[in-house]
C-alpha cells in the first residue's frame, strides 16, 4: 500500500513558569507591533481589551520581563509598543516555527512519499 496524500499537523508553543507563548500571544504581540494599539489589536483579533491585557500581564508576571510599553491618550493620542524583549521573543518564536515547519515537511516527504 502506498501512503500518499497525508500531511503532518502539529502545534508548537513555549512555556515558562506556567505561562504559554503560542499562536495566540504571538498574534496579539504582532498586531500590537503593527497597529501601535492594544485596543485596535484586540479588536482585530476578536478579543476584548481586558482579555488582551490579561494575557500580556500574566506572561509579564510569570516570565519576569515587560512585553508592552504604553502611553495613555490625550491630544496626541495614546500608543502601545513592544519592548525589546518582546520583539526578540516574537522574532525568535517565528524563526523557531519556520524551522520546525520545514523539518516536519521534510519528515512528511520522507515517510509518506518514499523519497
Regions from the PLM with identified roles:
Residues 35-42:
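Short helix-boundary/capping micro-motifs
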Residues 55:
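Residues within the DNA-recognition helix of helix-turn-helix
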Residues 70-95:
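Basic, amphipathic "hinge/linker" alpha-helix immediately C-terminal to the N-terminal HTH DNA-binding motif
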Residues 46-47:
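Central "turn" residue of the DNA-binding helix-turn-helix
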Residues 89-111:
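Alpha-helical linker/hinge and terminal dimerization helices associated
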Residues 4-17:
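Short, Lys/Arg-enriched N-terminal segment that forms or immediately precedes the first helix
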Residues 61-66:
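Residue cluster at the C-terminal edge of the helix-turn-helix DNA-binding motif
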Amino acid at each position: 500500500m502506498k501512503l500518499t496524500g497525508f500531511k503532518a499537523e502539529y502545534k508548537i508553543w513555549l512555556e515558562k513558569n506556567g505561562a504559554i507563548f503560542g499562536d495566540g500571544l504571538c498574534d496579539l504581540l504582532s498586531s500590537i507591533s503593527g497597529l501601535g494599539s492594544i485596543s485596535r489589536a484586540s479588536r482585530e483579533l476578536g478579543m476584548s481589551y481586558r482579555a488582551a491585557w490579561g494575557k500580556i500581564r500574566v506572561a509579564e508576571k510569570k516570565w519576569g520581563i515587560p512585553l508592552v510599553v504604553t502611553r495613555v491618550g490625550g491630544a496626541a493620542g495614546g500608543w502601545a509598543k513592544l519592548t525589546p524583549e518582546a520583539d526578540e521573543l516574537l522574532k525568535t518564536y517565528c524563526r523557531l516555527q519556520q524551522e520546525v515547519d520545514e523539518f516536519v515537511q521534510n519528515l512528511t516527504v520522507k515517510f509518506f512519499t518514499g523519497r
